[in-house]
From Swiss-Prot:
This is Lysine--tRNA ligase. Binds 3 Mg(2+) ions per subunit. Mg(2+) 1 binds at residues 424, 431. Its cofactor is Mg(2+). One of its GO terms (molecular function) is magnesium ion binding. HAMAP family: Lys_tRNA_synth_class2. The keyword Aminoacyl-tRNA synthetase applies. Belongs to the class-II aminoacyl-tRNA synthetase family. The keyword Amino-acid biosynthesis does not apply. Pfam families: tRNA-synt_2, tRNA_anti-codon. It comes from Cupriavidus necator (strain ATCC 17699 / DSM 428 / KCTC 22496 / NCIMB 10442 / H16 / Stanier 337). GO terms for cellular component: cytosol.
């Protein structure tokens, strides 16, 4: 449930910022020590019967007269975010996992001893109450508290004023605080969960079986990326954190599971940027007797449904621009995309490898680098596309017909030499998905692996290894198959209007804290 951005939903002002935080912590530790002396400082016998958001929704139109005539008994707990002490009566705004609700606490109802203790409780404390719903004179739904308890003492003060965590890195580093004080952050991760649940549901509806494949690989494969390396002590062997599950999922296709998918983590020992995190979530799926055209239709439908399920609409706003996922996605070849956004390039120039190498140098591309060892015309066109068109693909666009030399696992085109039946989906200038008709010719796959090994020997750290067991699996025969990977984190960025991938990962990787 999305939390309202109301005044009461704002994080509370903690102790005055002029007071030293260490002094506040010391004072709270003294309070905790006193609680320990009294017996049970962290009681664990309270069981809520209601949550704040459900009460707000169910009784939003209920008048005070109705609540008096048919009392609603509730037991609710949460973190105290606001506190107003006024003599014999006080108010506290309490936040649970769903939202916020106000407690009305009077000395006559809870007793003099409990009320006196409450006045010394701090913002951030976890408290519980039993009582009845009522409306204040201002019409706010509240709990008339009859029983009040302190369940967990907060030792650290919440961020001051109404700004939450002002430092962006601190939001990532101390996500637990960010979640406490920011309803926007909580809504982002609820939307993430809704999107993933949507994907799972629609995959099941389409007859896919969810599976789990290894995270530790004896040979890294399934993508062009640099792996994290570890060591298995019991087996005394080097292992690699998986960069992609692809080759294991296709082994399952060989084994007879004709539709499989997996949502899990991949690990790539590469740079960190607003679009990249070394540990990230992907959904990969494979369907026998399909091809890349079927995959494009299916992927488009999946993403559209995920948007509707997570945000309620396929028409979104991303970074102050409209993003319409309801319309058919565009489909362009690499050269068509180049000429759409850089029309100065002629067909003849795009077919001239020498011209392209010279042109790429103007963009600062080192065409003598190891990854250009076997670079043909298609690779040079692809790099020019990345320099001129990729970032401008705001509307959902499938770029199709990738060159063989950069698509070692994709099926070659039957009609166009040097091209594979592969696509990448771009939205707002970011790659969201990558899919293709799978190469199921064991001998062709072995030849492509050998070429990848040549590139690795020449210094290309992202080139693939030769996976002999995968070749053996293909030799048993794999049916015609289509496979696709969708970047969950980047998809959630779109659905939540988040500019940085760290905004949609609960605990993103950061430099070590000094």
């Amino acid at each position: 449930m999305t939390e309202p951005n109301r005044a009461q939903a704002k994080p509370a002002a903690a102790d005055t910022p002029a007071v030293d935080e260490n002094k506040i912590i010391a004072e709270r530790r003294e309070k905790l020590a006193a609680l320990r002396q009294q017996g049970v400082p962290f009681p664990n016998d309270f069981r809520p019967t209601h949550q704040a958001a459900a009460l707000q929704a169910q009784y939003t139109e209920t008048e005070q007269a109705t609540l008096e005539a048919a009392p609603v008994e509730v037991a609710i707990a949460g973190r105290m975010m606001l506190k107003r002490v006024m003599g014999k009566a006080s108010f506290a705004t309490v936040q649970d996992g769903s939202g916020q609700i106000q407690f009305y606490i009077t000395r006559d109802k809870v007793g003099e001893e409990v009320y006196a203790a409450f006045k010394h409780w701090d913002l951030g404390d976890i408290i519980s109450a039993r009582g009845e719903l009522f409306r204040t004179n201002k019409g706010e739904l509240s709990v008339q508290v009859r029983e009040l308890r302190l369940l967990s003492k907060s030792l650290r003060p919440l961020p001051d004023k109404f700004h939450g965590l002002a430092d962006q890195e601190m939001k990532y580093r101390q996500r637990y605080v960010d979640l406490i004080v920011s309803p926007e952050t909580r809504n982002t991760f609820r939307a993430r969960t809704n999107a993933i649940s949507s994907l799972r549901r629609h995959m099941a509806d389409a007859g896919f079986m969810e599976v789990e494949t290894p995270m530790l690989h004896p040979i890294p494969g399934g993508a062009a990326a640099k792996p994290f390396i570890t060591h298995h002590n019991a087996l005394d062997m080097q292992m690699f954190m998986r960069i992609a599950p692809e080759l294991y999922l296709k082994r399952l296709i060989v084994g007879g599971f004709e539709r499989v998918f997996e949502i899990n983590r991949n690990f790539r020992n590469e740079g960190v940027s607003p679009r990249h995190n070394p540990e990230f979530t992907m959904m990969e799926f494979y369907a026998a007797y399909t091809d890349y055209r079927w995959l494009m239709d299916f992927t488009e439908d999946l993403i559209r449904k995920a948007a509707i399920d997570a945000r309620g609409s396929a028409v979104l706003t991303y970074q102050d621009r409209e993003l319409d996922l309801s319309k058919p996605f565009h489909r362009l070849t690499i050269c068509q995309a180049i000429q759409k956004f850089a029309p100065q390039y002629t067909d003849a120039q795009l077919a001239d490898a020498g011209f392209l190498r010279t042109e790429l140098k103007k963009f600062g591309v080192n065409t003598n680098a190891p990854q250009f060892l076997n670079a043909g015309l298609g690779t040079l066109q692809l790099v020019l596309f990345e320099e001129t068109a990729e970032n401008q693909l705001w509307e959902p666009t499938f770029i199709v017909d990738y060159p063989v030399e950069v698509s070692p696992l994709a099926r070659a085109s039957d009609t166009v030499p040097g091209i594979t039946e592969r696509f990448e989906l771009f939205i707002t200038g970011r790659e969201i998905a990558n899919g293709f008709s799978e190469l199921n010719d064991a001998e062709d796959q072995a030849d492509r692996f050998r070429k990848q090994v040549e590139q690795k020997d020449a210094g290309d750290e992202e080139a693939m290894y030769f996976d002999a067991d995968y070749i053996r699996a293909l030799e048993y025969g794999m049916p015609p198959t289509g496979g696709c990977g969708i970047g969950i984190d980047r998809l959630v960025m779109l659905l939540t209007d988040s500019p940085n991938i760290r905004d949609v990962i609960l605990f993103p990787h950061l430099r070590r804290e000094d």
